[in-house]
């Protein structure tokens, strides 16, 4: 079953799904902007196209991730994103 989600007044949209190859996941697109997301469980984020400037929990420096790169976010935390161009991503929930 597919589940559509919309955040930040429609600037971030995703479709949640479960498959045998990825487990529970969502794929989405972010418009230009700055966003803060909270996590309930650990997440693995893969940039599909574009780029994300990311500030992970406990870090003091932002890091840019581009197409094909992956970063992990701990559960029960917040992370910050700066998006300079429309960017697509895959988020896998690792619980």
From Swiss-Prot:
The keyword Glycosyltransferase applies. InterPro entries: Ppnp, RmlC-like_jellyroll, RmlC_Cupin_sf. One of its GO terms (molecular function) is uridine phosphorylase activity. Gene3D superfamilies: Jelly Rolls (2.60.120.10). One of its GO terms (cellular component) is cytosol. Its EC number is 2.4.2.1, 2.4.2.2. Keywords: Glycosyltransferase, Transferase. Coiled coil: none annotated. It catalyses: a purine D-ribonucleoside + phosphate = a purine nucleobase + alpha-D-ribose 1-phosphate; adenosine + phosphate = alpha-D-ribose 1-phosphate + adenine; cytidine + phosphate = cytosine + alpha-D-ribose 1-phosphate; guanosine + phosphate = alpha-D-ribose 1-phosphate + guanine. Belongs to the nucleoside phosphorylase PpnP family. Catalyzes the phosphorolysis of diverse nucleosides, yielding D-ribose 1-phosphate and the respective free bases. Can use uridine, adenosine, guanosine, cytidine, thymidine, inosine and xanthosine as substrates. Also catalyzes the reverse reactions. HAMAP family: Nucleos_phosphorylase_PpnP (MF_01537). PANTHER family: PYRIMIDINE/PURINE NUCLEOSIDE PHOSPHORYLASE, PYRIMIDINE_PURINE NUCLEOSIDE PHOSPHORYLASE. This is Pyrimidine/purine nucleoside phosphorylase. It comes from Enterobacter sp. (strain 638). The gene is ppnP.
